[in-house]
Structure formats: structure tokens, C-alpha cells
Amino acid sequence: MKIALAQLNYHVGNFESNTAHIIQNIKKAKQNGADLVVFAELCVCGYPARDFLEFSEFINQCELAAQQIAAECMDIACIIGLPIPNHKPEGKDLNNSAYFIEKGKVKAVVNKALLPNYDIFDEYRYFEPSTEFSCIDFKGKRIALTICEDLWNTIENPLYITRPMDTLIKQNPDVMINIAASPFSYNHDEERIAILKDNAARYNLPLFYINHVGAQTELIFDGGSLVFDNAGNLIDELPYFEESLTYYTLGDKGAVSFNHPSTLKKERESDIAQIHQALLLGIRDYFHKSGFSRAILGLSGGIDSAVVCALAVEALGAENVMAVLLPSKFSSDHSLKDAEDLVNNLGCMSETIAIKNITEAIETTLHPQFKDLPFNIAEENIQSRTRAILLMAMCNKFGYILLNTSNKSEAAVGYGTLYGDMCGGISVIGDVYKTQVFELARYINRDKEIIPENSIVKPPSAELRPGQKDSDSLPEYDILDKVLAGYIEHRQSATEIIKMGYDEATVHRAIKLINLAEHKRYQTPPILRVSPKAFGMGRRMPIVGKYLQ
């Protein structure tokens, strides 16, 4: 039996595009002699559809699309994922399902049993878990078809009380196929491989795993679909961060063969290399799928905006990126030069708009209220908000999307101005710690200098007052980021972090700042997720909570 794995980029709710893309790949697979072509979880509607799933018309559109797809499957079988109504009288209204289509008709329906309800996953909000498990017979082979999390329930770390494959294995399947929607975070590919490898070896069956590729708002899907033999050996993996249609032959006794050169990686890419690829895909798809093509950002001469600008140019093209220099009376000459050098290196569009006259006019207007009170954060934030007003005016006039340039360290401790430098359409590096931003800059410069060296080595500064440095207000980033990661990503308490050797006062101050800044994060743009625990939909904290204040 010849199996084709179709690793594709879908668009949530875009039934016309998704259906056409699926049918196009069915036709390609048929031309190449495939018996079965496999698509990803909820491919028909895109993942995650979120509250679109609460509209009955949305579910009807899924079924209409499935029927269009089925009409193309007279001489080839396919597996597609879609939400369908739960016809049982009890439980949620929907099932997260897979259709096995053969000879133009739905031959079998498989419903997902294990519904993730953690971090960015919220499937139990919409779907009823299945309690029935049956294999599918096709071309003399018996297929154990599962959906994503149904294979994620490992013996070592069980998340659920059931394990669908324990039931399916009793039906003597010849092969496992798992359709998935597994988003990217650094190191997640290694976890994914380990879990699937364990399943293939435990059940002594070859395993075909197909994933989404592409970005849906903040979630980035890295592809990297996998094929294992029945001993649990990883024998092939599809490319990361790009589409692929790849063919395999399933022989007797679980043998799997293929004719293409193996794309199996000899060694895993570094976290920073993966983050770089993920952010490029995240930017590109956010713009393409939202119907925009051009980006704008404020360019300060610092490392954060430099990295975001370089990523935007690589993702969208220099002709589609506008960098705006917005110097104030506190901006240093070297920062302006660093920004100009970056623009020259990238070849993107640029404008310079001085904000000194505007901020002074605002300060003069407020003088009757401010009187002779000393300069403080109020005047600092006027500068940041003035820049935001100008950038958003450019967006409205010329049709740009504003790129937010705040990093995760700043977002964590609230080192940013609401309605100022925290505004934007998408936050590019809001899930990238400051120390990782430095690494990302070095990675971008791996072949030649794109980001000026001075932007990388000079002390970070917001330049909102004379001689200002980030370290005046925050611990050094190489210490702060480790404390932040412990609290945010590993959910460690202050006591646990202090026991690791970090200064007690620093730890308590950092955690206090994180919790005090929660209200700011509720008002930030969507953040491209690259870590296991990003701010946004996967981290839900109360604004007025007192715990750990």
C-alpha cells in the first residue's frame, strides 16, 4: 500500500482555500500512484477554530467541504480531519473527528478520545471525547487511526485514564496513523519524537504521523511529520516549517520503504535556529492570512527593533517594510547611526520623524496641571506614546501593520508603556527573552553583518531620560531571564528559585513585577509563541489576584 503524507498550511475558516489545497494534493498523490493520502487534524476548517466552532453554519461548511473532497476520491482513499456533530443525546455538541474516505464516500469515522485542556489547548470547551475505538480495513491492511493527543498518553506520564491504542491493538492492526495539530515550541520536536517512538516500539507497529505547518495568529505549526518502523526507529521526517507531499510504501510485516532521499536530520537544530525559522513563518502567515502585505515599526537603534526589522525584511521583503526613526532629545547620536546603518544593510524603506517639538508641546499643554513637579515616568511615557501615535497614523494612512518590538523579559516585568511601545498588530519577539534576542541577532549575522555590532554590544536603554540604561531599573538580563523562566515556564515558587542560588531580593522583586504587570499584558497584541509557556492564550492569570504579590 502506497501512502502519501500531505503536510500543508491551512487557514482557519477559509474553506475555499483549504478545500482547494486538499484536492490539489489528492490529485498529485493520485498521479503518483498513492493508494491513500493523509491530511492533518481539523484540516478542513484549520486549527484552532476556537469559537467559530459554536456556529452551526461553520460546522455545515465543514461537511460541505468534506463532500467536495470525497468527490475527488473515487480512485484514491484519503483521511481528513474536521469537526462533526455529536449525534448522541448527551455530551458536547461536537466531535473532533477524522473521515476515512474511499470510492467517493465516507467509509469510517474516528472521533478523538483524549482532548487536551492545558496551555494553549482548549478542546474540551467544544468537543465530546470518544469512548469507542475501531480499526479501518483498507487494501488488505488494518489501520489504527488516532488523532493527535490519543497517542500522547505515555505510560511514564499519563495525563488521562484511557489509552486508545490499548484497545485498538487488540484488533490486530498492521499500522498506526496519527493525524495531528501540534504547535511549535523550542525542544518540542524532541518530546514529540520521543513519545511517538515509544508508541511505535510498544505496540510493535509502524507509525505515520502528520502535522500542520504554518501559523494561525500566535500559534506556529512547524510540520516535521514523522515515520517510524515497528521497532520504534525514526526512519524519515518531513521538512520543518514548509509544506511537503511525501510517499511511502507499507509492505508485509510492518516494513516501510520509500524512494526519495531521506530528510532525516543527523542532528537537531539549535533552539535559536528553530526560533528564527518559526518567527519568519509567523510573520509571513500573519500578514498573508490577514490580507496585509506591508509592515511598519519604530527603529530605535537598539537590538530589539533591529532584530524585528531584520526578521520582517527576511519574511516580507525589503520593499514591504517601513522603518521609522523617531528620535527625541534624549536619543544618542550612535543610536541614530546604528538605525541608519541597519536600514542601509537591509535596503528597506525608512523615514525620520523627530518627536522633540511634539513632546514639548504636550508638556507645555500639561504644565498647568504638572506645575513644577520633577521630570518622571509621566514625561518618559509621553515620548513613547507620541511615537505610537505617529506610527499608527502611518498605518492608517498607508495600510501598514505595526510590528511590536517588545521582548519577553520586558513584557514579563512590565518594562514598557501601555499605548506606547506596547502597541502593535502582532508582537514578534514577545516570547523571546532578552538574552535570546542577543543570540538571535548573532544568528541573523551568522554569514555577514546585518545588525550593526554596536546595537548588539551596547548596554540596552530605552533612552527616555539622560544616561538611562535598562540595568538602572532591572537586574542584569542574564540573571533576570533565568528567574523569569523558572517562574513563568517551570512554575517554580520564589523559594524554589532562591534555592537554585539566586539572590533573594532579586527573585522577590522580579516575581512582584511580573504579577503587577498582568494588566499590561492583557492589553498587548498577539504574541508569536515559540516557548512552552508564552504570554497570551496559554497563560491565564488574574489581574487583581493577590497570590505571590
Q: Can you name each region flagged by the protein language model?
A:
Residues N204, N230, V256-G301, S305-Q549:
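ATP/NTP-dependent adenylation/nucleotidyl-transfer catalytic domains that generate, transfer
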Residues M1-G298, C309-A318, L325, S350:
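Enzyme catalytic cores with a strong preference for nitrogen-chemistry domains
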